[in-house]
Curated annotation (Swiss-Prot):
It comes from Homo sapiens (Human). InterPro entries: Anti_prolifrtn (IPR002087), BTG (IPR033332), BTG-like_sf (IPR036054). Residues 138-162 are annotated as: Disordered. Ubiquitous. High expression in the ventricular zone of the developing central nervous system. High in ovary, testis, prostate, thymus and lung. This is Protein BTG3. Overexpression impairs serum-induced cell cycle progression from the G0/G1 to S phase. The gene is BTG3.
């Protein structure tokens, strides 16, 4: 377990020194605190006979869902440095298993072996050389700190001018944007002689004019109320001031 943790610590210190934000003393202090934290975490979750057991628990991971690894953050707090000064990639995964440490930059990239151990008694210099060789084999794209999510976002933001023109709203004519006026209300004509046929069925009125189209026939006259003259019933007559009923004048 010591060799694997040493490989992880060398891996982080190499990245931090490349970022060149911290002094040598701060980097060494961070490496010491991280070593103690990982040793305490892994001591009861280390299974040499079955290396894959507890792999998720020992994994160190940073991605868009987990921006900061809690163990690395704790090492920063214990060494009085800022997490942002480490300069770690936005997507980084380290699998710390018995006899092997693997790494992956970005969620969609292939993993590579940081260090593998056949001999438990390897010294720190040999471990450091293994980690250095592994990092040197990684391309510069891995070290740029770009993530797969950033690449997807940048691709989405790139819009061709032709696509903007094609997606623009079509030019509408003014007549298409103005709704036709509501038709005026006209009363139905009164019934006239001859509106009913001999079979008892009423003739149909002309079909209504579709909404929005002018009437092609004769113009309808505006509605005018018909004056009503009241005619007194038979037997009643009036004088100048009031109506007189002749039955009321009969002797009792």
């Amino acid at each position: 377990m010591k060799n694997e943790i040493a490989a992880v610590v060398f891996f982080f210190t190499r990245l931090v020194r490349k970022h060149d934000k911290l002094k040598k003393e701060a980097v060494e202090r961070f490496a010491e605190k991280l070593t103690l934290i990982l040793q305490e975490k892994y001591k009861n979750h280390w299974y040499p006979e079955k290396p894959s057991k507890g792999q998720a628990y020992r994994c160190i991971r940073v991605n868009k869902f987990q921006r900061v690894d809690p163990d690395v953050l704790k090492a920063c707090e214990n060494s009085c440095i800022l997490y942002s000064d480490l300069g770690l990639p936005k997507e980084l995964t380290l699998w710390v298993d018995p006899c092997e440490v693997c790494c992956r930059y970005g969620e969609k990239n292939n993993a590579f072996i940081v260090a593998s151990f056949e001999n438990k008694d390897e010294n720190k210099d040999e471990i450091s050389r293994k980690v250095t060789r592994a990092l040197d084999k990684v391309t510069s794209d891995y070290h740029s700190g770009s993530s797969s999510s950033d690449e997807e976002t940048s691709k989405e933001m790139e819009v061709k001018p032709s696509s903007v023109t094609a997606a623009a709203s079509p030019v509408y004519q003014i007549s298409e944007l103005i709704f036709p006026p509501l038709p005026m209300w006209h009363p139905l004509p009164r019934k006239k002689p001859g509106m009913y046929r001999g079979n008892g069925h009423q003739n149909h009125y002309p079909p209504p004019v579709p909404f929005g189209y002018p009437n092609q026939g004769r113009k309808n006259k505006p509605y005018r109320p018909i004056p009503v003259t009241w005619v007194p019933p038979p037997g009643m007559h009036c004088d100048r001031n009031h109506w007189i009923n002749p039955h009321m004048l009969a002797p009792h």
